Amino acid sequence: MNYFIGDLHLFNRNQTGEGVNYDGRPFATVAEMNQYILEHWNAKITNGDTVYILGDMAMRGRNEALIALVAQLKGQKILFRGNHDDLSDYRYQKLFADITDYREISESFDGQSYKLCLMHYPILMWNGQHRGSILLYAHTHNTVEETFFQKCVKELNENKKLSVQQGKPIR
C-alpha cells in the first residue's frame, strides 16, 4: 500500500516547545516529537508498504541519531527533496529507495484511479490538473502562503483560459 507524508522535520527544535514551534505541534521536546512520529509510523506502515515523503524529512542528514531513527522507520521510503533536507551523507541517502524532486504515479481511492503529481513545493500548474490529477505537496505548512496558494489554484481552475488566446500569437 502507498502512503504519503511531508514536513516531518525530525530533530527540528523549532517544531516543538524547545523552539519557536512554527506549526503549533503538541510536543515539549524534539525527543518526544521524534518518538511519537516513529511509533505512529511503525504502527501503520509495514515493510511491504511504500511511503512517499514529500520533503523536509529532517533538518540535517549527517546526524547519527537521525540516521538511526530513519533506519527504524518501516517501509520503502521515497524522498522528495525539500529545502531542509541535507543529503550529503551517503549513509542517510541509502535509507531511501529513491530520492527525487518530482514524480507522477497512479493511485486508486474509493474505486477510482487518479494521477498524482508529487513534489515538495506547490506549483500553480501541474500535469493533468484540469483532467482530475491531484498535486500532493508539503512545504507551506499552515501559513499565509498556503492560503494564498489555495486561492490562486481555485482561481486558475475556475478560469480555464489558454495563455495564447484563440491560437494566435500574442505580444
Regions found by a protein language model. Give the residues of each.
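Core catalytic region of metal-dependent phosphoesterases/phosphodiesterases
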Residues: Y3-G6, L10-E104
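Conserved beta-sheet core of the metallophosphoesterase superfamily
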Residues: K94-R171
